[in-house]
Amino acid sequence: MIRIPVALPMDSYDICIDEGGLERLGEYLAELGKVNRALVVSNPVVLRHYGARVVRSLNAAGFETASVTVPAGERHKHLRSVERIYQAALEHRLERSSLIVALGGGVVGDMAGFAASTWLRGIRVAQVPTTLLAMVDAAIGGKTGVNHPLGKNLIGTFHQPCLVLIDPQVLGTLPPRETRAAMAEVIKYGVIWDGDLFKRLEQLPSLQRPDARTLTTLLVRSCQAKAEVVVRDEREGGLRAILNYGHTVGHALESATGYRRYLHGEGVALGMAAAGRVAVALDLWSPEELRRQEALIIKARLPVRWKSDIASEALLLRMQSDKKVEAGKVRFVLPEAIGRVHTGVEVPTEVLRRVLDTLRG
């Protein structure tokens, strides 16, 4: 078992990477002190695969346990789905000493975390991610939220989990497309924070389906990178903004296509391709390092262009609703070197439009 501490002033917790850890979830949570009830939030597919194992572990540790499902997919990440969690919390009589277990990918984690942060003005949540993307990103750091018709994650809170439990064994059932999409976030950490990780990715023969040992190594490096950033800036007052690299254009693409065309990681890959080109256009980044980034994205069989039916003007409009807009201006995270980025960069609209146009088709 590998334990990565997230040492925050008020809400410290551990990221535990444990083969077969689902069987021991109840033991991990029992260590946290008095908890009387647990509500497992999942989607129907994940609950069918892993729900019985998780509930059995929780019951064995003395929890009164119930479960509720929310629809799978980003397009269902809205307040109506969260209301299902509230209803289950009411029926199961969750108290302030109770907790919610988020069992699933990033959509489940975001909604379960949001529900936990608002139920009785805040109860504990344990993040148990079952996708690689959620393991390396969404489950860590305490961001929760749901979408609004005009933009992604516009409604949300900061609510740190009491535990992040990662069981790599569950990745054996993950579809190949999901694994590839998660690699976008791993590549992101290499660009924004860990140049050695970027070089390691370049050296690997394949990023499409890494072997178990390589995957665990990438998991650990990515979790460490995210934890290091969050510890330095829990509430995104400055440094943590680097984690938004690729997300401004990525979120706009996801939203503009109704969350049906691109997985989140695919959107991030496209967003990084766009941000990298913007950085080169502004003379902030070298064309050679842009080429290296795009080579890694392609190596993971991720897209670097989108279909021509997505109008640049539609993306520009979506970006105006981005939660990172300040004083009416869209702010970008742009690379300056592998392992280092600028934050809060205001990009001239004509430069951004030109880059978006070059990536269509």
Curated annotation (Swiss-Prot):
GO biological process: amino acid biosynthetic process; aromatic amino acid family biosynthetic process; chorismate biosynthetic process
GO cellular component, one term: cytoplasm
Purpose: Catalyzes the conversion of 3-deoxy-D-arabino-heptulosonate 7-phosphate (DAHP) to dehydroquinate (DHQ).
UniProt keywords, alphabetically: Amino-acid biosynthesis, Aromatic amino acid biosynthesis, Cobalt, Cytoplasm, Lyase, Metal-binding, NAD, Nucleotide-binding, Zinc
Note accompanying the cofactor annotation: Binds 1 divalent metal cation per subunit. Can use either Co(2+) or Zn(2+).
UniProt-listed InterPro entries: Dehydroquinate_synthase (IPR050071), DHQ_synth_AroB (IPR016037), DHQ_synth_fam (IPR030963), DHQS/DOIS_N (IPR030960), DHQS_C (IPR056179)
Disulfide bonds: none
Protein name stated in the entry: 3-dehydroquinate synthase
Binding-site residues, NAD(+): G106, V107, V108, G109, D110, T130, T131, K143, K152
Superkingdom, taxonomy of origin: Bacteria
Swiss-Prot/TrEMBL catalytic activity: 7-phospho-2-dehydro-3-deoxy-D-arabino-heptonate = 3-dehydroquinate + phosphate
Pathway in which this enzyme or protein is active: Metabolic intermediate biosynthesis; chorismate biosynthesis; chorismate from D-erythrose 4-phosphate and phosphoenolpyruvate: step 2/7
Cofactor requirements of the protein: NAD(+); Co(2+); Zn(2+)
Segments traversing the membrane: none
Localization of this protein: Cytoplasm
EC number, as in UniProt: 4.2.3.4
Enzyme class label: lyase
Binding site for Zn(2+): E185, H247, H264
Single GO term (MF): metal ion binding
Family the UniProt entry places it in: Belongs to the sugar phosphate cyclases superfamily. Dehydroquinate synthase family.
Coarse class of the protein's main subcellular location: cytoplasm
Pfam families membership: DHQ_synthase, DHQS_C
Organism per entry: Gloeobacter violaceus (strain ATCC 29082 / PCC 7421)
